[in-house]
Amino acid sequence: MSRRVMFKFRLYLAGDALNSAQALANLSAFCREHLPDRHEIEVVDVFREPKRALADSIFMTPTVIVLAPPPVRRIVGTLSHTLTMLLALGLDPHVP
């Protein structure tokens, strides 16, 4: 995958729950390290926007939807495993 591709994430969280805070911190750190200047993160709180969560079929939090590049993917959990994230995004884990 080209190193210039823009990644767009929509992260669904449940208020200020610990696992929600961890997911946001982990996704932000991952993007800073592996996708500098090539990412956008939209955060949606399911308590504040439940209809939006239902429209996107979000039934567990935290869940991140990778909107771009295609295909659309979902990753559930705190996003703490860097290798899993790299592979899910189609990035080479051996490229710094």
Task: Report residues per predicted region.
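Solvent-exposed alpha-helical segments within well-ordered globular domains of core cellular machineries
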Residues: 22-25, 29, 51, 83, ...
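Domain-scale activation on soluble regions of proteins
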Residues: 7, 33-37, 41, 52, ...
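Local sequence-structure signature of Cys/Sec-based thiol-disulfide redox active-site neighborhoods
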Residues: 2-33
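Thioredoxin-like thiol-disulfide oxidoreductase module
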Residues: 44-60, 89-93
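Ser/Thr/Gly-rich flexible loops in soluble cytosolic domains mediating phosphotransfer, phosphorylation
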Residues: 79-96
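A short, hydrophobic beta-strand/beta-hairpin element that forms part of a small beta-sheet core
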Residues: 62-73
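A structural boundary/capping signal
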Residues: 2-3, 7, 40, 45, ...
